From Swiss-Prot:
Organism, scientific name: Candida albicans (strain SC5314 / ATCC MYA-2876)
Lineage start: Eukaryota, Fungi, Dikarya, Ascomycota, Saccharomycotina
Annotated EC: 1.18.1.-
Domain spans labelled Flavodoxin-like: 5-151
Localisation: Cytoplasm; Mitochondrion
Protein name listed in UniProt: NADPH-dependent diflavin oxidoreductase 1
Length: 589
């Protein structure tokens, strides 16, 4: 055993990964090494047995208490019944869950991982922690306390370790350099390479845009798209999702390169990369700084703490302005003043590009640190809205565009890219199976779907109709206005299918019969009570996370109380029982 420290993360949106990256920076500042960092699925399991002594896992929970996609293989392995109970007896373990207590299966993933690893012989390194994002202290508050206990435990194991100077620039993790030859690559000549060279890797397929039409009225603030594309050999079911792989816009990449003159001079020279970070689908075969920033590195997301913790090292403090800017960036990269980072980056939704442009006068970033500094562009997931087809996919996508408190327009990286796609354009995508499954057993289905939550419900409804099933479907849909964002009017105008029962709520129409979906549900208490209690109906709830899923569940509890005469406790247990039996499912994002 070599005494290695291994940090593994399971992350769907990047939050858990960010804490893992930041923790590695913090441990390196104590000269603790070697330290490995990888997703749960990317780290070789054999090394956990042969090299790792101290295992740190940071993991979020997604969907119905599920492990993030980059941790599913790891979870499948450790759940094998034939594994010996002393397999990991050499490992000392601590875990950190990134969660939100508004979800029923709060921090469920890290609980499962921690419990199973302890069953396989792990010893406790420092106390586990389950952070709650909606608590007053937020995830940071939990993390600070957990990290302090972890570092104290590790320093006890490594008595020779000590805090090194904060001024020392850490060595880059990834090896990137510019070719010394005089060769330059014309971006127009390799425009297809980032797509073609990645096809087939990690299940990536080629999609061709068929339609990209606006569903909402032109005078409505929200642009919602009906996005259809074709491909070959498709295999999906209602509830499955598509991951789209967007890219940055040329004007943004140009602005970034111009902010660092030393980059602009070599922007189209071939790059030499070794020790790549993991990226779903891999990197393009032909890379320059320009193509790396366009197709692989996220320059439009909000900069995170680990970004600033490295960035401040590259500011020239020889002038008064430089010294002040370096100090400011250092504060943003520290946990000592978390509100400073929030006010600068999160509150105004400031992008990485905007940050670099603001500090460009005193900032010189070495090429060798680019992969350490910039996050990777993540694929974005969308629920499939079409009934199963081997040739086509339909998505319902809300375009992210809004003004911040500083009156600047912000646009989502993926939806801005998607909005500009035209029929015939090609792009990369992959399909993921979901636990949100439909089974035609003739029992009724109650569907609750405000806004774009309609997408997976549309897939299900269209399949039932196409198969001429006798299954009764009850859809409770919510939006703001009947005439502006009434998506079901676009999909089932003049519905004549006797199996499909539509009820709509319009929150901003003063003459609407129901304001919210929960109002419509409660108004149909007698019907829903009969469907649930007497006909074993299933309930599917889809849409934005937050208040909606919680209030819908409370409404179902009230309906059960009203229909059966149960008290509050028994009605809650009944709904929990439906969840445990797979008859009540939520898909919130």
């Amino acid at each position: 055993m070599t005494g290695e420290i291994t940090i593994l993360y399971g992350s769907e949106t990047g939050n858990a990964e960010e804490y893992a990256k930041y923790l590695k920076q913090r441990l390196r500042s104590y000269n603790l090494k070697p330290i490995n960092l990888a997703s749960l699925d990317d780290y070789p399991l054999k090394r956990l047995v042969t090299h790792t002594s101290y295992l740190i896992i940071i993991c979020s929970t997604t969907g119905q208490g599920e492990i993030p996609r980059n941790g599913k293989k790891f979870m499948k392995f450790i759940l094998k019944k034939k594994l010996p109970s002393d397999l990991f007896q050499h490992l000392q373990l601590t875990t950190f869950g990134v969660g939100d207590s508004s979800y029923v299966k709060y921090n469920y993933a890290i609980k499962k991982i921690h419990t199973r690893l302890m069953q396989l012989g792990c010893q406790l390194l420092s106390p586990r922690c389950e952070a709650d994002e909606i608590s007053p202290e937020g995830v940071d508050g939990y993390y600070i306390e957990w990290e302090a206990e972890l570092i104290a435990a590790l320093l006890n194991k490594f008595p020779s370790a000590s805090k090194i100077s904060s001024e020392a620039v850490p060595m880059p993790e990834y090896r990137i350099s510019v070719s010394k030859s005089d060769t330059t690559i014309d971006p127009k000549e390799v425009i297809d390479n980032p797509i073609v060279s990645r096809l087939g890797k990690d299940g990536l397929k080629l999609g061709t845009v068929l339609e990209n039409n606006r569903l909402t009225s032109s005078n409505h603030f929200q642009d919602v798209r009906d996005f259809k594309f074709s491909s070959n050999g498709l295999n999906y079911l209602p509830g499955d999702t598509v991951s789209l792989f967007p890219c940055n816009f040329d004007e943004d990449v140009d602005a970034l390169l111009q902010s660092q003159p030393q980059w602009l001079k070599i922007a189209d020279k071939p790059l030499n990369l070794k020790n790549f970070p993991h990226l779903e689908g891999g990197f393009a075969d032909i890379l320059t700084l320009r193509t790396l920033f366009k197709y692989h590195l996220d320059i439009m997301s909000i900069p995170r703490r680990s970004f600033f913790a490295l960035l401040w090292h590259f500011v020239d403090p020889s002038t008064e302005d430089g010294e002040r800017e370096q100090e400011k960036l250092k504060e943003f990269g520290s946990l000592d003043e978390p509100e400073e980072l929030y006010d600068y980056a999160n509150r105004p939704r400031r992008s990485i590009l905007e940050t670099l442009l603001e500090f460009e006068n005193n900032l010189t970033i070495p090429v060798s640190y680019i992969l350490d500094l910039f996050p990777l562009i993540r694929p974005r997931m969308f629920s499939i809205a079409s009934c199963p087809s081997s040739k086509e996919v339909e998505l319902v996508v809300a375009i992210v565009e809004y003004k911040t408190i500083i009156r600047k327009i912000r646009r989502g990286v993926c939806t801005r890219w998607l909005k500009n796609l035209k029929p015939g354009d090609q792009f990369l995508f992959s399909i993921q199976r979901s636990s949100f499954k439909y089974k035609d057993d003739n029992s009724p289905i109650i569907m609750v779907a405000p806004g774009t939550g309609i997408a997976p419900m549309k897939s299900l409804i269209d399949e039932v109709i196409q198969n001429n099933s006798k299954q009764e479907l009850y859809l409770f849909f919510g939006c703001r206005f009947k005439e502006k964002d009434n998506l079901i009017e676009s999909f089932w105008h003049g519905n004549e299918n006797q199996n499909l029962h539509l009820v709509s709520a319009y929150s901003r129409d003063s003459n609407s019969k129901y304001r919210y979906v929960q109002d419509a549900l409660f108004a149909h208490s007698e019907l829903i009570g009969k469907l649930l209690i007497e006909q074993n109906a299933k309930v599917f709830v889809c849409g934005s996370s937050g208040k909606m899923p919680r209030e819908v569940k409370i409404t179902f509890v009230e309906i059960v109380k009203k229909f059966t005469g149960m008290d509050e406790g028994d009605a809650q247990k009944y709904i929990i029982g439906l969840e445990d039996n797979g008859r009540y499912k939520e898909d919130a994002w």
